[in-house]
Amino acid sequence: MSLADHIFIDMCNDILTNGTSTEGEKVRPHWPDGTPAYTIKKFGVVNRYDLSKEFPALTLRRTAIKSCVDELLWIWQKKSNNVHELKSHIWDSWADENGSIGKAYGYQMQVKHQYKEGMMDQVDRVLYDLKENPYSRRIMTNIYVHEDLHEMNLYPCAYSMTFNVTKEEGSEQLTLNGILNQRSQDVLTANNWNVCQYAVLLHMFAQVCGMKAGELVHVIADAHIYDRHIPLIEELISREPLPAPKFWLNPEVKDFYDFTPDDVRLEDYETHPQIKNIPVAI
């Protein structure tokens, strides 16, 4: 059965049982009708996914892998902050009349910085180090740039990736691991979406650097379930986990910038029905 499902169920039960409520407090998020969007939250949630064992897509409900990869590449490959370059409309609420979300997410990825080796943006620096200095303990990205926060329509939720390379005993191939740091997460709408995105990213980076994907560690400072999501979460975690899907990444792609969503597939992906009409706090 899917290990990712069990991790998700345990996390949700922990939040519902041991979390704290923001009801009655001053909160920024609200529902479309103007009502404050309160949460039950848990501080410092850490989940670990061994990508060598399975791809961590939930079977409790379907995760739209093409759409989440499209968004991942929008940020990491296109380095864009314009929602018109996305196939989905997830970000429309935070875009201005021109489609821009300001100096957030992809904008920060395309900013070049001076290094001893020359000018590079954060993505190219990671790829350079993974190929030239894989055992460096300094391979990371960070898009939570304080001087630009006032020009971001949405502060980054998933804001930092740290990459770490190991070598298993008896193996000639290096293993690429990663830590995803997230300041805040809406568990129902975004948890598995983000997990699948960064699992794909690790697989992509590993492939183009001649490595194999290892462990993804997901650190969430504020993991929360919104008040109007509680019955939906309870329904979701009552379902029986199914076998994890098989992950396919086009082996012909050797350059990260050549990947498209069509180069990613989940095979034998059997899931429970989707939960529809999920209210989204803004």
What are these regions (language model features)?
Residues 1-282:
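Terminal, non-catalytic protein-protein interaction segments that mediate quaternary/complex assembly
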